C-alpha cells in the first residue's frame, strides 16, 4: 500500500490502525486521518495530535463554520442538539474530559408534563427494562406520537428488591403486566444480559422481548440529543427517574469516558429506549 485514509479514526481500535499502517510499504507512503474529538486520554490524541510536530504531521482543526455549504439554520439545528461535553467535542472540536452531570440539560420545568395523553391508535407504545435482582428493577412505559414527533415516559416501575425483598422473574413479569395495563405496546426492550427474564416474557407469548442496544456512550448521546431537541418528556409521576437525572454523573477518575455506576437503573432503561426504539422513530427527523 502507498497510503490509507482512516475515516473516524477515533472510533477504530489502535491495533487495527497500526496494522494498516504497517502494510504501507511503498516509499513515501502517506496517511490521512479525520475524527471527532474524544476523551483527551484517547490513544490517537496522545500519540498523534499531541505529537504532531514530532511526527511531521499537518494537523488541521475544523468546525462547522469552515463548511461553507451548511446553511445557517442547519448549523443552528446541529448546535442545538448537544450540550456539555458533547457540545464542546462535536461542535467546538475540543478534546475535553467528561465531567459533572451526564444530563445537565434536563430541566424539570421543561421536560415534565402534568397529564398522561389518552390512548391513541396512531401512537406507538414501548416498555424499556433495566433488570436487577439485588439492584433495583427499573422499567418505563413510553408513548410515542408520530404526528408530534415526541415521546413521553408516561409511567415508571422502580422496585428495590435488595437482599431481603428479592423476588423471582414471575413476580417481575406480573409487575410489567401491571405497568403495561391496556397499552398496546410494540415490544419490551430489555437489558441484553437478562436472559432469564427474556425467557419468562417469551414463555407467556403476550409480549415480544427485544434485546436493547447497550452501547452506553452512543446511547447517552441519543438521550442528550432528544432532550435538547424537545423530543423526550416525562410524566410528573416518574419521580425515581427525576432523582437519577439529578445525580447521574461522569466518573472523573477514569481515563476513558465512563459513568459512575450508582443509582443509574432508570437512566439505563431510558437509554435502552432511546437507543433501540426512539432513534429509529426519529432517524429521518433528528
Regions found by a protein language model. Give the residues of each.
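Inter-Walker segment of RecA-like/P-loop motor cores
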Residues: 1-2, 95
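Short beta-strand scaffold segments in enzyme catalytic cores
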Residues: 137-143, 271
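Short, glycine/acidic-enriched loop or turn micro-motifs at the edges of active sites
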Residues: 10-11, 133, 146, 194
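Hydrophobic residues at beta-strand termini and immediately following loops
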Residues: 60-62, 91, 212
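ASCE P-loop NTPase helicase motor core
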Residues: 3, 11-81
Amino acid at each position: 500500500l502507498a497510503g490509507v485514509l482512516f475515516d473516524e479514526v477515533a472510533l477504530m481500535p489502535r491495533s487495527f490502525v497500526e496494522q494498516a499502517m504497517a502494510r504501507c510499504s511503498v516509499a513515501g507512503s502517506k496517511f490521512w486521518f479525520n475524527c471527532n474529538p474524544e476523551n483527551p486520554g484517547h490513544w490517537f490524541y496522545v500519540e498523534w495530535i499531541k505529537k504532531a510536530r514530532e511526527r511531521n504531521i499537518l494537523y488541521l482543526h475544523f468546525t462547522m463554520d469552515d463548511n461553507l455549504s451548511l446553511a445557517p439554520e442547519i448549523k443552528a439545528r446541529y448546535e442545538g442538539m448537544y450540550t456539555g461535553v458533547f457540545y464542546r467535542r462535536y461542535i467546538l472540536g475540543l478534546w475535553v474530559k467528561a465531567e459533572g452531570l451526564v444530563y445537565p440539560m434536563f430541566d424539570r420545568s421543561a421536560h415534565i408534563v402534568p397529564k398522561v395523553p389518552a390512548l391513541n391508535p396512531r401512537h406507538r407504545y414501548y416498555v424499556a427494562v433495566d433488570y436487577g435482582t439485588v439492584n433495583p428493577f427499573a422499567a418505563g412505559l413510553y408513548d410515542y406520537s408520530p404526528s408530534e414527533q415526541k415521546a413521553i415516559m408516561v409511567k415508571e416501575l422502580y422496585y428495590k428488591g435488595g437482599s431481603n425483598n428479592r423476588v423471582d422473574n414471575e413476580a417481575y413479569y406480573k409487575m410489567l403486566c401491571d405497568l403495561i395495563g391496556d397499552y398496546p405496546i410494540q415490544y419490551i426492550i430489555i437489558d441484553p444480559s437478562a436472559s432469564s427474564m427474556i425467557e419468562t416474557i417469551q414463555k407467556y407469548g403476550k409480549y415480544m422481548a427485544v434485546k436493547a442496544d447497550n452501547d452506553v456512550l452512543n446511547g447517552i448521546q441519543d438521550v442528550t440529543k432528544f432532550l435538547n431537541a424537545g423530543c423526550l418528556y416525562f410524566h410528573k409521576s416518574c419521580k425515581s427517574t427525576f432523582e437519577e437525572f439529578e445525580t447521574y454523573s461522569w466518573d472523573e477518575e477514569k481515563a476513558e469516558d465512563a459513568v459512575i455506576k450508582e443509582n443509574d437503573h432508570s437512566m439505563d432503561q431510558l437509554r435502552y429506549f432511546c437507543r433501540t426504539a426512539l432513534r429509529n422513530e426519529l432517524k429521518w427527523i433528528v
